[in-house]
C-alpha cells in the first residue's frame, strides 16, 4: 500500500512539473531558459518563432519598467523642443532670404577672444515675422586661407528670434555663416514622420541550410501574418525579426544587406521643403566678413586636456586643420608610447572603424590578426606583441544599414560586448552610436543608448579604473534623402546621448561640434578630423 501511495504521489508530482513547464513556456519561453540557465541564444540573441510581430518593437510585458519611463522622459523633453508646426503653404514657412541677421554692437575691428553676437529675425516667404521658433540653424565662422573654423552657439527665444554667438578665436579676415538647415515647419514634419514608421529601410536576411540558400525580409518591425524568426536580446528587450524561410531554421541566418524602401510619411507639400534648394540656405547675405586683431590681449594659459574635464560651448576651433579645444590644451603625444600596454576596444559604426584604419596606418608595428571573417564590417584586431598593444574594432548590433552584404554570424549588441570585458586601468573603451539609427523612430536609438549606459555602469562598478570615451555622432552629406538621413535626426540623437551619459565618468569627444567647425559634410569625415579626434583621445588616456 505504501508503495502504491508513493507511486501515486510521484505521478501527481510529475503531472504538476509538466503542467508548470507547459504554462511557463506558454507565458514566457525566454524565462524558462533563464530558470534552467540553458543556452537559448544564437550569437547572444534568443531565437523565438512567432506567427506575427507587434507593430512596435518588443517591450517587457510587465508594467512600465525603469527603461520605459526613461525613454518616455527623454521623448517628452524632445517633444517640447519640437512642437507641431502645420502649415498651409510654402509661403508661410521660414525663408532664409527674407530673414534678417543683425550684428549687435558692430565694430570696424574686433579683438581675439571677444564674443560677437548676431540677432536673427525669422521671416516667412511673404516677409512676415515668424511668431515661433524651432528653425534648425547651423552657425559657423571660418577663414579658409588659414584652414580655420568654429561653430557658433544658437539660442532660440521661441518667438521667431535667435541669438547667434561666436567666440573670436583667431585673428584675420573671418567669414560668418548662419545656415537655415530646415525651417521649423520642416523640422516638425521630419520629427513626426521619423516617429511614425519603421519601414523606410528593409533588410534582406540570407539563410543557408545545407545546399539551399534563401533570402527573406527582415526588420526591427515586420507587420506580417507569416511565421517570423525573432532574434531577441532578452536582457535589454531589443528584438530584430526576419520572415522564417520554409523548412530552414532561424539559426541558419548568415548574412544581411539593406535597401531603401519606396515609402514616405511626409505629405507632398512637406516634401517640397526638402528639395536641395531649400536645404542649408544662407541667412547672412554678402556682408558677412569681419576683421579680427590680436589687440595686444594676453593669451590665457590653459591646462592640459585630461579625462573628465568639462567642455565649453563651442568646444573648440580648427586652426591650420588642427583641433584646439576651448577649455584646455592638447599636448603632443606619441601615439605608440601612449598605447603601450593598453587594450583598446573600439565599438560602433564605420566612423569608429576609421579610427582602426588610422591606427593601423600610423603605427607600422601593428599587425592585423586574421579572424576569418569577410566584408567591410568584419571584426578587426591589430596587435603589437613587443609593445603589448591590442586594438580591436567591432560593429554595433542591428540596425546596420548597408547595400553591401555583411556577416551577422557574430553580431551582438554593444552592451553584451561590454558585459564580457573585465576591465582595468589599461583597458580603454571608445564607443559611438548614431548614423544607422537615423531612419528609425528615435525610441530605438534611446533604448540602445540606455542599454549601453547600463552595461557601462556595471563595468565601472566592477572595474572603476577602466577608461570609457564616447565619440558623438558627426554631421553628414546634404543630399535629398532628408526624411531618412537629415542632420536634424542626428542632432536630436546627439542631444539624447549627452543627456543619457551625463551622469557617468565618461570622456566625451564632440565629433558633432568638430565636424561643424571643420565644415565637413561627410558621413566619413576626412583624415584631419579623425586625427584630431584621436589626438583628444590620446590626451584623455595618457
From Swiss-Prot:
Glycans are attached at residues 91-92, 159, 223. Its main location: secreted. This is NXPE family member 4. The keyword Magnesium does not apply. It is found in: Secreted. GO terms for cellular component: extracellular region. Residues 1-26 form the signal peptide. Keywords: Glycoprotein, Secreted, Signal. Belongs to the NXPE family. The gene is Nxpe4.
Amino acid at each position: 500500500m505504501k508503495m502504491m501511495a508513493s507511486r501515486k504521489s510521484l505521478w501527481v508530482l510529475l503531472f504538476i512539473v509538466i503542467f508548470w513547464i507547459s504554462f511557463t513556456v506558454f507565458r514566457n519561453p525566454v524565462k524558462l531558459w533563464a530558470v534552467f540557465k540553458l543556452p537559448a541564444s544564437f550569437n547572444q540573441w534568443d531565437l523565438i518563432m512567432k506567427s506575427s510581430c507587434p507593430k512596435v518593437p518588443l517591450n517587457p510585458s510587465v508594467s512600465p519598467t525603469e527603461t520605459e519611463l526613461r525613454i518616455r522622459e527623454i521623448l517628452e523633453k524632445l517633444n517640447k523642443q519640437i512642437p507641431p508646426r502645420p502649415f498651409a503653404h510654402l509661403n508661410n514657412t521660414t525663408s532664409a532670404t527674407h530673414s534678417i541677421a543683425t550684428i549687435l554692437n558692430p565694430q570696424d575691428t574686433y579683438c581675439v577672444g571677444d564674443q560677437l553676437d548676431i540677432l536673427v529675425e525669422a521671416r516667412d516667404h511673404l516677409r512676415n515675422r515668424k511668431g515661433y521658433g524651432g528653425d534648425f540653424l547651423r552657425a559657423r565662422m571660418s577663414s579658409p586661407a588659414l584652414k580655420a573654423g568654429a561653430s557658433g552657439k544658437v539660442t532660440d527665444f521661441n518667438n521667431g528670434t535667435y541669438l547667434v554667438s561666436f567666440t573670436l578665436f583667431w585673428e584675420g579676415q573671418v567669414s560668418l555663416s548662419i545656415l537655415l538647415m530646415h525651417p521649423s515647419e520642416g523640422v516638425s514634419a521630419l520629427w513626426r514622420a521619423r516617429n511614425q514608421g519603421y519601414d523606410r529601410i528593409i533588410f534582406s536576411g540570407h539563410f543557408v541550410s545545407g545546399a539551399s540558400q534563401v533570402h527573406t525580409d527582415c526588420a526591427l518591425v515586420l507587420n506580417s501574418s507569416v511565421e517570423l524568426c525573432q532574434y531577441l536580446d532578452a536582457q535589454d528587450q531589443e528584438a530584430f525579426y526576419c520572415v522564417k524561410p520554409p523548412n530552414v531554421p532561424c539559426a541558419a541566418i548568415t548574412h544581411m544587406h539593406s535597401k531603401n524602401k519606396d515609402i514616405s510619411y511626409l505629405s507632398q507639400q512637406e516634401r517640397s521643403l526638402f528639395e536641395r534648394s531649400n536645404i542649408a540656405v544662407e541667412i547672412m547675405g554678402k556682408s558677412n566678413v569681419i576683421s579680427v586683431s590680436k589687440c595686444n590681449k594676453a593669451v590665457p594659459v590653459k591646462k592640459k586636456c585630461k579625462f573628465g574635464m568639462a567642455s565649453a560651448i563651442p568646444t573648440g576651433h580648427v586652426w591650420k586643420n588642427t583641433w584646439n579645444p576651448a577649455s584646455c590644451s592638447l599636448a603632443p603625444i606619441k601615439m605608440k608610447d601612449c598605447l603601450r600596454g593598453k587594450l583598446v576596444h573600439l565599438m560602433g559604426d564605420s566612423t569608429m572603424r576609421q579610427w582602426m584604419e588610422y591606427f593601423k596606418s600610423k603605427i607600422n608595428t601593428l599587425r592585423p590578426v586574421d579572424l576569418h571573417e569577410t566584408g567591410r564590417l568584419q571584426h578587426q584586431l591589430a596587435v603589437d606583441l613587443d609593445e603589448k598593444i591590442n586594438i580591436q574594432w567591432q560593429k554595433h548590433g542591428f540596425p546596420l544599414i548597408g547595400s553591401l552584404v555583411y556577416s551577422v554570424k557574430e553580431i551582438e549588441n554593444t552592451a553584451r560586448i561590454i558585459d564580457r570585458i573585465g576591465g582595468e586601468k589599461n583597458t580603454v573603451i571608445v564607443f559611438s552610436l548614431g548614423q544607422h539609427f537615423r531612419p528609425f523612430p528615435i525610441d530605438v536609438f534611446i533604448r540602445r543608448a540606455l542599454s549601453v549606459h547600463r552595461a557601462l555602469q556595471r563595468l565601472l562598478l566592477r572595474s572603476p579604473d577602466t577608461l570609457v570615451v564616447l565619440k558623438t555622432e558627426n554631421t553628414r552629406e546634404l543630399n535629398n534623402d532628408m526624411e531618412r538621413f537629415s542632420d536634424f535626426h542626428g542632432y536630436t540623437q546627439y542631444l539624447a546621448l549627452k543627456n543619457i551619459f551625463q551622469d557617468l565618468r565618461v570622456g566625451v569627444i564632440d565629433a558633432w561640434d568638430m565636424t561643424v567647425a571643420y565644415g565637413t559634410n561627410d558621413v566619413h569625415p576626412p583624415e584631419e578630423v579623425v586625427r584630431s579626434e584621436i589626438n583628444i583621445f590620446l590626451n584623455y588616456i595618457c
